[in-house]
Amino acid sequence: MPAYIHEAMVAAYVRDATYVPMDDETLGPYIKPWLGAEGQEAFYRQIFQNDPRYTDEVQPLYGRIERPVMIVWGEEDRWIPLEKGEQLHKAIPGSQLRTIPRCAHLAQEDAPEAVAEFLTDFLAP
């Protein structure tokens, strides 16, 4: 595939991961690893491996987790719906689920202050 078409496809894909439109400067570091011949191959390999069976097979092990877990999820995530975050929360004993309204998959871009606050609270002694 021509590099310019691949780059446009990757950019469109990554832009869909935020609720707030992402500018080109912010987008750059997200798409750079998926550009060039090796990056293009890696991108499509990752897309083809996006199969629930890979997580479904380890899901029974989640109940064994004995460490504190905080799950941060954007309520407008179009890549992995909030329902999956809720299932994960139910499967991990004692976990916390923190959701962010008007936020998609890349919560650190859509709501950096909320993510920082959640992490600060979670990691505080």
Which positions does each model-derived feature cover?
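Catalytic active-site module of serine/aspartate enzymes centered on a nucleophile-bearing elbow/loop
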Residues: G94-P125
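Helix-rich cap/lid subdomain of alpha/beta-hydrolase
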Residues: M1-K32, E41-R45
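Residues at helix-coil transition
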Residues: R15-T18, L35-G36, P93, A124
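Conserved catalytic core of Hanks-type protein kinase domains
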Residues: Y4, P33, R64, A91, ...
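Conserved serine/cysteine hydrolase catalytic core
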Residues: D24, L35-K90, T99
